[in-house]
Amino acid sequence: MTVSSSSSQVPVSSSHIDANGNVVMIDVSQKAPSARAATAKGFIAVSSHVVAAVRNQQMKKGDVLTVAQLAGIMGAKKTAELIPLCHPLPLTNCLVTLEVTDCGIWATCTAKTQGPTGVEMEALTGASVALCRSEERRVGKECRSRWSPYH
């Protein structure tokens, strides 16, 4: 597979593309299971009136922080259905925490499993889905991710 630019063709490699250019799922059947953990953190900017409504539990949609936590956990559990070529993983733990600041909300998702492949995508999906809950139509998003070893 190559990507064409105006001056040249650049070969592109991916672990999800075989030598014939076919899309493949990575074979992890020979990898030994091990304890795996990943943490992802994301931010959504909202207006000061939304921050006040969230803090005072006056949102029209109810307790949005609890709903966002549940949505994040459900999102992490559904990662293989949402993102192509992700292995379905039995999560052994998923924790979503939310922190309201003066300009928005931080969501942190930590996912854990015992298996042959990592849970980075589950943590990223969990944090992202938790942040999809917003009263305003126009919001800015800034996503940061960080992975940590399982202890």
Report each predicted region and the residues it spans:
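Positively charged, low-complexity/disordered segments
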Residues: G140-H151
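C-terminal binding/interaction regions
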Residues: T2-S4, V10-L65, L70-H87, L91-R138
